[in-house]
Amino acid sequence: MGEFFKDADGKMPYNGLRDEKIPDNLRIVTAEEALTYVENYDGYYYSIEIKDSGYLGFKAADILYKILSDMNLIERVIVASFNKDVILYLEENYPDLHRTAYNIEAAGLFFDAVFGIDRPEGYYKFDILQVPPDKYIVNMGTSKLINHAHKNNVAVQYWTINDTERMIFLNNIGADGIITDIPNVAYEVLRLQDKG
């Protein structure tokens, strides 16, 4: 949750919190602390994003890989980054890590889907496409894209979906995951839909 997070009532409870106004229970935890905490409950799968580019992104990748390796979590983590340099660094240094597509790769898969271009097995070097369905000029939230991705062993996850009708639509066309600011609402909506 960031400073601009909105709760169900549209309020932003963390907006403007600085210095001594930040309560102790809002301390930022380390990746290792967060993973250890969640691992106490169940064997979840994770999507972890590296925000930095360049040297800091590479250093973050190195640290993250060590944590994941030490905790035996490599197979249950997808690493994401908007930075092509970080993605290429991951691919070169940690080929056993699962990763998302960077923007040019995502566009390539999209156009392959639209034009029905079949690629050889292993052509796509990424395991998951994490995209907004309609933020760009093109609509990425289609069954055609999802079906093409699945045919090539690529999962499709959409962000940031806070509209319940959109959640249902994406679920119905085969989306593998939905990133949302309201996971409790998404859980209930999709759970009820799956029952119905």
What are these regions (language model features)?
Residues 101-109:
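Hydrophobic alpha-helical transmembrane segments of multi-pass integral membrane proteins
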Residues 50, 103, 160:
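Short beta-strand/turn micro-motifs composed of small residues
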Residues 47, 98-100, 157:
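Short, well-structured secondary-structure segments
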Residues 1-88, 92-93, 125-152:
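Metal-dependent phosphodiesterase/phospholipase catalytic core, i.e.
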Residues 83, 95-98, 188:
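Active-site-proximal helices and loops of the catalytic beta/alpha 8
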Residues 21, 109-196:
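C-terminal active-site rim and adjoining tail of enzyme catalytic domains
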Residues 25, 80-82, 101, 161, ...:
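Short beta-strand scaffold positions
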